[in-house]
Design a protein with these regions (language model features):
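Right-handed parallel beta-helix
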Residues: 199-201, 206, 220-230, 244-255, ...
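Extracellular beta-rich repeat passengers
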Residues: 368-507
């Protein structure tokens, strides 16, 4: 270790860590002094079973601040995908993942073992983490749970994903009759599935790997908890069908052969703290079909298809989808959409997707060459679906590779649909911001006068620092949409762009 990394000064009054000479001013968030006085620092790390593949691009150490003992984290190997837009072939990349739990304040040290570090970025950018850098080693401090990506020299695949979670409040006893306990090590089942009865919790302890799809079918009051991993499953990670009051906690789904989580005709489902990585075709994150009262909170999704997809009828699922909230989460779509709503439905007995909320999200990337499948946020009703009462609040979008910021289209995609969607109504987008290269044109497209987009309001839409509003300064003959840029066709009715002050005055 270089001398500059072996010396440090005491915590400042605000709790920020300052490293010695050779580093620039540390601005990563640190514990406030008053909190440090009452919170006992704690750090929990977990082993990676030797049978699970690792990656050798990074070394990661962590310690309680200011002067705890350094602990080296085991590195896991998630795999990521990228589609060649000329051939349609998919390339798979090995990446890195480490995770731990903590309370109080911790210092994280990451060393890029490949060398040659010239640029470092810790994402999401909204966290404001500016690490101290010395050679190929960087340090930063955390005082609250964060899921971050450490990116070296703009490499978005051979990067480090770091899950810094809160310490579990209560771990079940291994012999609890209501717990299906899996301890550290690799576990399998006879047929690659695990059927969970009502009232039971599957507990994957840290360091546990379960190679089975966890299935909740016609059950209630059941769930998954712990800090373990669902890896290499023959199907998806978890399947919830015709069930109610199901919880899925802060486990990690690595490289499944399907969706990380699939909900069908489920109600009262909470997914909190889940991490997910995929590289294969149809590698969606969380797909919701014909379900209600769903909360997705604090998840990190990096997927090779839609990160979050919300639909009505498909396969044997029937009924409306309502009251779905996605919040406090980070989404990265290597293929398709971070958020996609409305494609699949029931042309014979039309259904509704309503009361959908997307709040406090960081969208780190979106890459989709196909125009019909673009949009960091996409509302695309087909199959006679009606989408209504959608709220987007506090979504930050970083520079993405390929696609559109917003895409709303009442569609009849004959590849997937048997009828045109009925429409989109009552969408309120507040505090959506984008920072990056100039945007490709966003599309808002009603299908015809009977299948229109109605009553869409943007409040405080910010594109590269410019607030987009109907009252903004622009040539009088320009449309507000020209400044984004966005195209809204003649079947988009009552489209508004407001400043925050204008929205408050109108309320």
């Amino acid at each position: 270790m270089s001398p500059s990394l072996s010396r440090r000064s005491a915590l400042q009054a605000a709790g920020a860590t300052v490293l010695a000479a050779g580093f620039t001013q540390l601005s990563a968030t640190a514990a406030r002094a008053d909190e440090a006085a009452v919170v006992t620092p704690k750090l929990v790390t977990y082993p990676r079973p030797s049978a699970m593949p690792t990656n050798t691009s990074f070394k990661v150490r962590v310690r309680t601040a200011p002067d705890g003992e350094w602990q080296t984290l085991d590195i896991w190997r998630p795999q990521l995908g990228e589609i060649n837009p000329t051939t349609g072939s998919s390339k798979t990349y090995n990446s890195s993942l480490a995770y731990f739990d903590f309370q109080g304040s911790v210092e994280v040290e990451v060393t890029c073992l490949k060398g040659g570090t010239t640029k470092v970025r810790v994402r999401p950018d909204s966290y404001g983490i500016k690490p101290e850098v010395g050679g190929d080693t960087l340090r930063f401090t955390l005082d609250q749970p964060r899921n971050v990506v450490v990116q070296i020299n703009d490499d978005i695949f051979d990067c480090l994903h770091l899950f810094a979670r809160a310490v579990e409040k209560k771990k079940p006893a291994q012999d609890d009759p209501n717990v299906l306990y899996y301890g550290p090590g690799v576990h399998t089942t006879a047929d690659g599935t695990l059927l969970v009865p009502s009232g039971k919790t599957v507990y994957l302890d840290g360091g546990a790997v379960l190679k089975a799809t966890v299935i909740f079918r016609n059950v209630e009051h059941a769930g998954i908890a712990g800090r373990g991993v669902l890896a290499g499953t023959a199907g998806g990670g978890a399947l919830v069908e015709n069930s109610r009051n199901i919880s899925i906690g802060a486990v990690t789904v690595l490289n499944p052969n399907g969706y990380a989580v699939q909900l069908g005709e489920a109600t009262g489902v909470t997914i909190k703290g889940l991490g997910s990585f995929s590289s294969k075709g149809w590698g969606d994150g969380i797909d919701v079909f014909c379900s209600s009262n769903v909360v997705i909170d604090g998840v990190f999704m990096r997927n090779s298809d839609d990160c979050i997809a919300i639909y009505t009828h498909r396969w044997e699922y029937y009924g409306d989808t309502s009251n779905v909230t996605v919040r406090n989460s980070t989404l990265w779509a290597d293929v398709a959409h971070p958020i996609n709503v409305g494609t699949h439905g029931n042309s014979d007995n039309p259904e509704v997707l309503k009361n959908l909320t997307f709040k406090n999200l960081d969208i780190l990337d979106h890459r989709e060459p196909q125009m019909g499948y673009q949009g960091c946020i996409a509302l695309n009703p087909g199959d006679s679906n009606l989408i209504k009462n959608v709220k987007v609040d506090g979504v930050r979008v970083e520079d993405f590779r390929w696609g559109q910021l917003i895409h709303m289209r009442v569609m009849y995609n004959t590849k997937y649909n048997t009828s045109v969607g009925r429409g989109i109504q009552d969408v309120y987008v507040k505090d959506l911001s984008y920072t990056g290269k100039p945007l490709a044109t966003c599309l808002l497209l009603g299908y015809d006068a009977k299948h229109a987009i109605k009553d869409v309001t943007f409040e405080n839409l910010v594109v590269n620092g410019t607030v987009i509003a109907d009252s903004m300064k622009k040539p009088t003959w320009y449309l507000t949409t020209d400044t984004i840029p966005m195209h809204a066709n003649e079947h988009v009715l009552n489209l508004k762009f407001l400043t925050t002050a204008e929205a408050v005055a109108a309320s």
